[in-house]
Amino acid sequence: MKGEETLKKALLNIGKESPFYYYVLLGVKLVPSKNTRNLKLSFSTTGDVMLLYNPEAIGKKPLRMVQALLIHEVMHIVLQHFRIKPKDERDRKIWDLAMDAAINQYIPELAAFGVPLDVLVKEGHTTDNDTLFVLPPEWMMFENAEMYHKWILEEMERLGRYDVEVVAEFRDNVDDHSGLFEEDVPVEMILDLTKDRTKKAFNLFGNTLPSGVRREVSLSLENPELDWKTLLRRFFGVSIKADRYTTPLRPNRRYDHLPGWRNEYLPRIAAVVDTSGSIVEKELNQFISELEKISNIAGEELWLVQVDKSVTSAMKYRSGKWKDLEIVGGGSTDLQPAIDYSERVLRSEGTVVFTDGHTDVPIARRRILFVLSRYHNEEFLKEARKMYGRDAVVVLS
């Protein structure tokens, strides 16, 4: 009974101190489980979001630590980590590290007992998610799980895959996040179960969140709608780096007995964002969410061009840079200067244009893809498809 009482007290305290997380937790079913070390999320095929907890272990923990562990679990929900698709069991364990690093940095009680990810990888150790918790490298704070996963993979190649495999294997003995990736439960069902409650919680209590968390949750609620990997291949061919995978046909440079890495390529592209006065904040948030997805797939920086009646900004953009992104514009709309800049100055192979279409369709000499906001100009859509083909225009909902 002590564990259940501790859990209830922790929930009440969260309700007083962090109403956003409490509101989301109200939609979670608490299930005692002796097979769980502390806490673990899971989704059932009957439509329940379940939080498994070990009553004995929870009963022995300080109340503040139980609160911190509850917030940690609920952040996996609000950041929609269940949308992540690990390639295999080893990749799932690496995603566990990346997701935990992205979350723990925002929870002081866990950060106080944190070990930076770079130290763990370098020394071949891991945390137990009980007394020690993974944190991002000190020089890479406030990024998302995708960025930390990408960094781990790059360290794999630099140090040799064995080093990171050892770290991943050590996590066999701790509560993992396998419940987030239930194969029997479609991601769409999990989204239906969680997104509405998260959105309501954000609308009611989002202003109580720290600014970094608030922005992360806001972006997660504006999830990219488009399959960018397919779109980029279809329109632009292949040139910039995308996925990396191991192959026995290429020896590892450090360990002869291990497979090496091979890169899959996508095109060198530029992204143009319409920042004219007709674009509202919700549309910009959607554009940035899609831009993040492109950047994650590209695996490297790409050019971002902002435009109203002329080019207002041109910069190298990488995933996570939205935190420092200044939107420049607010005037009337003319996309042509941005297309000319992309093709003539940046010499891109193709251009992705985010706009509401309240302007003339620009002339492009190379490949182009228009991404229109929900409140777009229908005449622009018709004219763009007439000029460049039906598949050259996609519309966000």
From Swiss-Prot:
Pfam family, one: DUF2201
InterPro entries named in the record: Put_metallopeptidase_dom (IPR025154), VWA-like_dom (IPR018698)
Matching PANTHER family: SLL7028 PROTEIN
Protein name: Uncharacterized protein TM_0929
Upper taxonomic lineage: Bacteria, Thermotogati, Thermotogota, Thermotogae, Thermotogales
